[in-house]
Every structure is written in structure tokens, then in C-alpha cells.
Amino acid sequence: MAAGPCETCIVKRMTVLATALAVALGGYVVADAYDVTPGFLTTRPTESEALPYPSVSSASAPETLPSWNADAKVDNAAVTSALGSLAASPEAHGHVSAVVADAASGKTIAQLEPDTPRAPASNMKIVTAAVALRVLGPETTLKTTAKIEGKRLYLVGGGDALLGSGGANPAAVNGRAGIGELADKAADAARKAGVTEVVVDSSLFSGPQRNPSVTGGNASFVMELRPLAVNQSRNSGKAYTANPDIQAGQAFAKELAARGVPVSGAVRRGQAPKQAREAASVESAPVRDLVDFMLKHSDNTTAEILGHLVAVKSGEPASFEGAGRATLADLKKTGVNASGVVVDDNSGLSPKNRLSASLLNEIMKKVASCDGCALESITSGFPVSALDGTLDDRMRGSAAAGKVRAKTGTLSNAASLSGFLETKSGRLLTFSILIDGIPDGSFTSARHAIDSFVVSLAGA
């Protein structure tokens, strides 16, 4: 991204961001809908009907949406004082790094140990979002394919772990493409070929299915990583179940049988031979929507899958190590200070990850000044304070309610928050806060310290 974007572009982008915050405060969020390389990625636009304008009954939008005020002032002394209070707060417990900057000019207002690498928890997903949007492209979709060789039908995974169990749902991210939809498309060819067996091809991803650094209870927060799953292999209790690709294959075999394809026997794994012919395919929601889903819900599985796909696109093995190398390489290409950065996974679950507040804030500034670039969609995925996602129950009843779009991060010993906020004067700020080294059992207190700091910023 070129340095020093034009002032008009910045004002335009700031207005979009501020309006997005105002709209969120009014009670609804406008969602972008887009589509999108050969193989498991496709650049062909997907066909779907226009969706109705979103609305909710619990709140209404204000009659006039305020635009960003380019002449608004910020009390820099108040920001500096608030940061000092955060650093001295007994609630913070751990080691604090933070950066606050003016979104329009990019100038830093206050900072504390900005370049110290710290455990980012789920703020790692901000990096994953930026890298996935740049490397894969916001309009790219993930392709699940049915291929036939002899009497075998191969279900080839392309990275979509959010397949629906039935037909397609163009209004959803989870379930945009469906196993039933694929069976509808493949059934005729399967019957003509005399298919009797379903084989699952999960060869797109290599290496371990679980990151060895993610242990204990944290391992239960992410799916066994395969490039194919129905609803991320969650059961009715929302827990992840084993062998998600095999489960998807079993569901597909059942759908084929219901359409007169006499499949039988156990579904197994195997790589489709080169001569296998494609019978049908379905496509996921575009990467920009997957990024939104990941950020809004802090979805670890989507984060790891996007990282593995970045590795494939970058010529690295589709493993946790390959994803880490590809992610770091792309970061360095953007010119940010990546000193001390460690990318051990793409979700933030690994305690080995290290990012700096300055790096995260640099990404925020690039998003803020972006006019039509790949990163522009990141803000729509950030939760809104006191409204939705992982911020729905935070900062309620405060000056920051509905004024913050940010990504949360929580581990037992680390807490983080990075994003954008609108001050009481109408000025837009970028910020990043990382706290690590938090004693066991104290992360809730550390999150409260972060929230108190952000509320102070909103009043500056």
C-alpha cells in the first residue's frame, strides 16, 4: 500500500467508518455481499438473488446519520492520562502495551511499550484477516467438488468447513453451499457412471490436524483441521466432533442414496486420481464474508483454514508451520515492523504467538486510509460495543456503547482489544491494547481495565 494517501480519500474513508458506527448504534449493521483462482479457489462470480435490506425490531436507526467531523478535536492530554491510568491499574495485572492514534492523520497520540511483542490472543485474527484478504482476495470462494473415477465418487475438499447439511442458503455464511445441493448436481452423473462408493479427498491440507502448541481446554475451541466439513462438525451441543471430513462424506453418501445412487460401504479417505472427471461443485461464501464471520464470532476454525489456504496460495505446505511462514512473509511485504513477531497459529489460541500493539495499530491505520483496497471490508466484521459479536455485553450504558468497532482477544493469561472508536467530539481514533502475563483467574479483571480505558478514550 502506498504511503501518504490523499486527504480526500482519508476523509471519505473516515466518513464511511464513522457512519458505520452510527448505523450500528441505531441497531443494525449493513452487510456487504460479494462473490470470488483455479483449483479449490474460484474467481467466477456466484449467482444469487438480491437479499432484503437487514432490519431488527429491538432498535431503530436515527433519522439522520452523523458524518465524521474532520474539524473535531481530541483532548490529547486526556488520552495520555487515560493510558497512564491503564498502566497503573491494579485490574490490568499483567504487562501492558498500547497505542492510540488519530485515524485521519495517522499520528500517534499516546503509546506505551508499543513495539514489545506480546501474546495477542484472538487479536491474531486481525493479522489473519488482513493477510487472507490480500493473498486470497476478498471475492474468492472455496470450491467443494464431486469427481468420478470408475464407480467411485470423490468428495474433494477445498477449504469449506461451513457446508450446510441440505440445500444452498444464499443468505448465510454458514451453509452458503450445501451437501444436498452438491448431491442434486452430481446425482445424474453418478447414476450414469454406476457409482457405488464415496471417498473423501482431504489432501489439500497437510501436517497435523491439531496445533501441538494448543493444549488442554483450548484445544476444544477449534475443529480438527480438515478442508471439508458440515457446520464445522459441531454437534447439537456445539462441541466439535472427530473426523469432520468423513462425517461430511457420510452425509453426502446419504444424500446421494436418497437420489437413487446406490452407494454402500464405509466412507474412507483417498486422493482423487488425476483422471477423475468433475461431476459437480458448490462454492462457499466469499472470503470477505468468511473474514467477517471469523472476526464477529472470533471463530478459530475459520481463522486456521484461512491461514492454511494462504499457505497453499503462497507455495507453502498447508500446515500450521506453513501457514505461519506465509502469514509472516505477507506481513513483511507490507512494510510493517515485524520485529519479534511469532505466528504459531492463525486463530490466536497458541500461547507462542507474539504481536506488538504498534503492528496491530498499523493495520488499523491501513484499513482507515484504504479507499477500495482489499482491507476495506475488515471493519464490517469487527463487533460493535454493547451491540453484537464478542462485544455485545461489554461497555453497556457507557460513553463507548455503540461507538467502538474492535476485535477482542482472551486467553487465560492474555487479553487484547484493537480497532476504532469515535470520540464524543466526532473524531475517529485507532487503537490497540495488549496485556499478557496475566495471573491465572484474573483475565476478567484485565478485560475490565481495557474497557475502562476505551470508555475514557470515547470521552476524550
Question: Which residues does each predicted region cover?
Answer:
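C-terminal region of N-terminal signal peptides and the immediate post-cleavage residues
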Residues: 26-65, 141
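N-terminal export and membrane-targeting signals
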Residues: 1-24, 242
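Active-site SXXK
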Residues: 106, 120-138, 228, 251-256, ...
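Small-residue-rich helix-loop
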Residues: 111, 312-460
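Short active-site loop at a secondary-structure junction
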Residues: 94, 111-127, 131, 135-139, ...
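Beta-lactamase-like hydrolase cores
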Residues: 49-117, 183-194
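Mid-domain, small-residue-enriched loop/turn segments at the edges of structured enzyme/sensor domains
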Residues: 95, 154-180, 187-226, 233, ...
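A small/polar active-site loop signature that marks catalytic segments
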Residues: 224, 231-376
